[in-house]
Amino acid sequence: MNEVSVIKEGWLHKRGEYIKTWRPRYFLLKSDGSFIGYKERPEAPDQTLPPLNNFSVAECQLMKTERPRPNTFVIRCLQWTTVIERTFHVDSPDEREEWIRAIQMVANSLKQRGPGEDAMDYKCGSPSDSSTSEMMEVAVSKARAKVTMNDFDYLKLLGKGTFGKVILVREKATGRYYAMKILRKEVIIAKDEVAHTVTESRVLQNTRHPFLTALKYAFQTHDRLCFVMEYANGGDLFFHLSRERVFTEDRARFYGAEIVSALEYLHSTDVVYRDIKLENLMLDKDGHIKITDFGLSKEGISDGATMKTFCGTPEYLAPEVLEDNDYGRAVDWWGLGVVMYEMMCGRLPFYNQDHERLFELILMEEIRFPRTLGPEAKSLLAGLLKKDPKQRLGGGPSDAKEVMEHRFFLSINWQDVVQKKLLPPFKPQVTSEVDTRYFDDEFTAQSITITPPDRYDSLGSLELDQRTHFPQFSYSASIRE
């Protein structure tokens, strides 16, 4: 096994991803492709102090620019399973050339080594060394039974956004109902969401938990990716909370316990969810939680340049994400804190329409509670919403166990939770599987158009390229049932 060595090190000015200020960081570029940044210069290259930034330069792209400052360079690389861009500047053109040459050399040497370990790495705290192209090759496929769009009846539109739409469908052969997420390849590729989309598919395939949405099929057409998923028709918690304004502590405890159970399972498989928000917390027909991610932005389709600015809804971003620090499982406990605060207090813990002010609040403002909130609930929320992920409830090595052992959950039998033995505090009043009363009628009242306008349907020269991004994108859960 090759010993990892430091190829280049030194100070760089790194531009914040969310708060656009320049921060000095001491970076080490290593022979294994890791590119790690510290607030202070490490006393020894092998010191165990956790870095603030941790990227991989494998398969990276580099670009020189003189904006917004002279001697700037941009690295496009992989962090976790998302393609990201990070901007740096140095004091002279020569220094910039040295960094670019060193990074390119490491990237090239990794390419020559060829594929090593499994192409998808979900380990917490470190970026995946796999390249985007390798991820595409792994894509998704266990079954060869050909599933097509003709196998379904299309009943109602459930949601719509930047990348596509979600439709309630009925499988013709079985009469079963599913939610079909239809994503446009053109948009996924244009917005660098290929890695994220393939990751989502693999996570859905490999997870089996009562409070996580199961994937039944995944297939593609020449211009679409289609996920056929378990359908939960009890509506999302955003829908219910916006009508009821606040939940009782008992109701919030029930939902919180089911979310904790699902996060414990995901973390045990080295998956960090990263996107806990009310819109992603669905209820099934009995009132149990189903965590989903339809991958649709709430704002709908927009051509604005801000689309790519946020990975996740800004109000839910954890302080360590805003500060461009490397993050781990604790981001999910922050997300849990935000949604449970909303449930019990009827508002977000931090809110401002001005994003810069919002970020200041998330980073600096102390959490405040309404007088009506009980002491156990206050203690839980204060613990989950600690700014420092190491001090946060759930941020320690025992992860979910810390949260489960908090006195707010004292009455909860966790075995009963996962076995769905607890009685849901609210049972959706649905009369049939096609009853969509808990979905926004802004969508459900619309007629369904599977074929979008010509400018999206006619892909021309992009078509072949898109097939190379998503080879073997097919999956059927039936072989595992």
UniProtKB/Swiss-Prot annotation:
UniProt membrane topology term: Peripheral membrane protein
The keyword Magnesium is assigned to this record: no
SMART domains reported in the protein's UniProt record: PH (SM00233), S_TK_X (SM00133), S_TKc (SM00220)
Location of the PH domain: 5-108
Intrachain S-S bonds: 60-77
Residue numbers carrying N-acetylmethionine: 1
Activity regulation annotation text: Phosphorylation at Thr-309 (in the kinase domain) and Ser-474 (in the C-terminal regulatory region) is required for full activation. In adipocytes and hepatocytes, the activation is induced by insulin. AKT2 phosphorylation of PKP1 is induced by insulin.
Post-translational modification: Phosphorylation on Thr-309 and Ser-474 is required for full activity. Phosphorylation of the activation loop at Thr-309 by PDPK1/PDK1 is a prerequisite for full activation. Phosphorylated and activated by PDPK1/PDK1 in the presence of phosphatidylinositol 3,4,5-trisphosphate. Phosphorylation by mTORC2 in response to growth factors plays a key role in AKT1 activation: mTORC2 phosphorylates different sites depending on the context, such as Ser-474 or Ser-478, thereby facilitating subsequent phosphorylation of the activation loop by PDPK1/PDK1. Ubiquitinated; undergoes both 'Lys-48'- and 'Lys-63'-linked polyubiquitination. TRAF6-induced 'Lys-63'-linked AKT2 ubiquitination. When fully phosphorylated and translocated into the nucleus, undergoes 'Lys-48'-polyubiquitination catalyzed by TTC3, leading to its degradation by the proteasome.
Coiled-coil ranges per UniProt: none
AGC-kinase C-terminal domain span: 410-481
GO cellular component terms attached to this protein's record: cell cortex; cytoplasm; cytosol; early endosome; insulin-responsive compartment; nucleoplasm; nucleus; plasma membrane
Pfam family, one: PH
EC number(s) reported in the record: 2.7.11.1
Entry superkingdom: Eukaryota
Gene Ontology biological process terms from the UniProt entry: cellular response to high light intensity; cellular response to hormone stimulus; cellular response to insulin stimulus; glucose metabolic process; glycogen biosynthetic process; insulin receptor signaling pathway; intracellular signal transduction; negative regulation of apoptotic process
Residues that bind Mn(2+): 280, 293
Binding residues for ATP: 158-166, 181
Residues annotated as catalytic: 275 (proton acceptor)
Family, similarity comment: Belongs to the protein kinase superfamily. AGC Ser/Thr protein kinase family. RAC subfamily.
Assembly behavior: Interacts with BTBD10. Interacts with KCTD20. Interacts (via PH domain) with MTCP1, TCL1A and TCL1B; this interaction may facilitate AKT2 oligomerization and phosphorylation, hence increasing kinase activity. Interacts with PHB2; this interaction may be important for myogenic differentiation. Interacts (when phosphorylated) with CLIP3; this interaction promotes cell membrane localization. Interacts with WDFY2 (via WD repeats 1-3).
Function comment: Serine/threonine kinase closely related to AKT1 and AKT3. All 3 enzymes, AKT1, AKT2 and AKT3, are collectively known as AKT kinase. AKT regulates many processes including metabolism, proliferation, cell survival, growth and angiogenesis, through the phosphorylation of a range of downstream substrates. Over 100 substrates have been reported so far, although for most of them, the precise AKT kinase catalyzing the reaction was not specified. AKT regulates glucose uptake by mediating insulin-induced translocation of the SLC2A4/GLUT4 glucose transporter to the cell surface.
PANTHER family linked to this entry: RIBOSOMAL PROTEIN S6 KINASE (PTHR24351)
Domain-related comment: Binding of the PH domain to phosphatidylinositol 3,4,5-trisphosphate (PtdIns(3,4,5)P3) following phosphatidylinositol 3-kinase alpha (PIK3CA) activation results in AKT2 recruitment to the plasma membrane, exposition of a pair of serine and threonine residues for phosphorylation by membrane-associated PDPK1/PDK1 and activatio.
Protein name in UniProt: RAC-beta serine/threonine-protein kinase
